[in-house]
């Protein structure tokens, strides 16, 4: 028996505010020029947003307009929050991308586009949930998704403010299977509506009676049973959480990379996602690695899979591929033999990854809160520019979450 814990943060957490701003600006550059090369970092604090980074593009983006839109969408709309979309100051220090970097990703044959930087990226999948995600992180994300829905519905828990965090501890048995929920931690920003003790008691009661039943209702019956035994519940353990958001803590792009990925399971190469166009393999190759791992588990190759890809700047093919199945494989092949078959199934050149997952389109703001993985793919018609002319395009969001390579994997491993 052992315990494993993962955390998540809400869309109103200052670091996530920064991520969403960076990705919203990336989307607007890509909307007008799909060949845009973008790396945007955002800093948020009391009454102030600072954006900086490097961009190579033919498009013009109204930086202030889209920053204010994102902040208001998240819910920072009141002056009393000391950070709101209508009145915050905005400073832009975005400049042109280095030509030394650009030369590595521009080639005579577009399919041989090199990686935008060196580095290693990891993808992970397991069969603990229907989304092939680790259960502790999946539950932590659902808690905050439902809390945000409750806040926006405005019918109950009307004191909620945008900032919040969750943390879930799951107890596992000796066969590495979840056996029960051990601890739930919910910290949510709120209005000041009563004495400190009365506020904490009210919020804890509402979390237990309103939020958690909604969370459990989203789960399949097998996972619902994990909540049947008593568990520890901590709600706003400091007793009060009125001051929050960028007024309570500064926020920076790329500081929630474990929340964005697998909650501490698997591994992480260190590269953040938000604000980066898909020529940056920190992002695109991490999506590809997740796709490979998820399809391997879905195909029954193993119950748990970690995939590592590594690239060199300016080089199209990965310099290494690793697969780790943690002894859970269901086929008579070693992890090294499984890894050797990956390039025969998947084209891992950056240009082909970008093409397969439609990564040159404005799909990124949707990824910047509640995780880049374990999300349901969906198709949406987007207004974009093609050759300088307005156009509409059907684009799949979270395409790397599809399990449409299972047949290819089964064929490759049956030969």
Where are the model-predicted features located?
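Glycine-rich, mobile lid/loop segments that gate access to catalytic sites or pores
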Residues: 5, 65, 69-243, 369, ...
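Alpha-helical support elements that line or immediately flank enzyme active sites
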Residues: 11-30, 124, 128-148, 276-300
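Internal helix-turn-beta structural module
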Residues: 45, 304, 311-415
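A structural-propensity feature for long, helix-poor, extended segments
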Residues: 49, 152-177, 299-337
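Glycine-rich anion/phosphate-binding loop at the beta-strand->alpha-helix junction
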Residues: 195-297
């Amino acid at each position: 028996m052992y315990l494993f814990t993962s955390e998540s943060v809400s869309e109103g957490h200052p670091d996530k505010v920064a991520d969403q701003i960076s990705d919203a600006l990336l989307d607007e550059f890509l909307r007008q020029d799909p060949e845009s090369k973008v790396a945007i970092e955002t800093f948020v604090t009391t009454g102030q947003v600072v954006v900086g980074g490097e961009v190579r593009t033919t498009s013009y983006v109204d930086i202030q307009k889209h920053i204010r839109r994102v902040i208001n969408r998240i819910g920072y709309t009141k002056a009393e929050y000391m950070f709101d979309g209508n009145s915050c100051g905005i400073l832009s220090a975005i400049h042109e991308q280095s030509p030394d970097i650009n030369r590595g990703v521009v080639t005579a044959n577009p399919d041989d586009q090199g990686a935008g930087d060196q580095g290693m990226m990891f993808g992970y999948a397991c069969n603990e949930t229907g989304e092939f995600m680790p259960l502790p992180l999946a539950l932590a994300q659902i808690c905050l998704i439902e809390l945000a829905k409750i806040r926006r519905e405005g019918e109950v828990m009307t004191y909620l403010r945008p900032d919040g965090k969750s943390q879930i501890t799951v107890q596992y048995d000796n066969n590495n299977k979840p056996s029960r929920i051990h601890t739930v931690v919910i910290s949510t920003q709120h209005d000041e509506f009563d004495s400190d003790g009365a506020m904490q008691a009210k919020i804890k009661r509402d979390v237990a009676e309103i939020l958690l039943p909604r969370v459990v209702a989203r789960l399949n019956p097998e996972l619902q049973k994990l909540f049947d035994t008593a568990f520890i519940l901590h709600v706003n353990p400091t007793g009060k959480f009125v001051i929050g958001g960028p007024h309570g803590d500064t926020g920076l792009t790329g500081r929630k990379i474990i929340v964005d990925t697998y909650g501490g399971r698997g591994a992480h190469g260190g590269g953040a996602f938000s604000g980066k166009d898909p020529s940056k393999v920190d992002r695109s190759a991490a999506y590809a690695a997740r796709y490979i791992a998820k399809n391997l588990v879905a195909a029954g190759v193993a119950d748990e899979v970690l995939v590592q890809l590594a690239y060199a700047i300016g080089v199209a093919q990965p310099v290494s591929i690793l697969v780790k199945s943690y002894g859970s494989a269901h086929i008579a092949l070693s992890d090294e033999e499984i890894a050797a078959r990956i390039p025969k199934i998947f084209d891992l050149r950056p240009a082909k990854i970008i093409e397969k997952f439609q990564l040159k389109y404005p799909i990124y703001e949707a990824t910047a809160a509640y995780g880049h993985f374990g999300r349901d793919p969906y198709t949406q018609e987007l207004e974009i520019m093609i050759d300088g002319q307005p156009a509409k395009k059907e684009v799949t969001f979270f395409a790397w979450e599809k399990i449409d390579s299972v047949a290819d994997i089964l064929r490759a491993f049956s030969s």
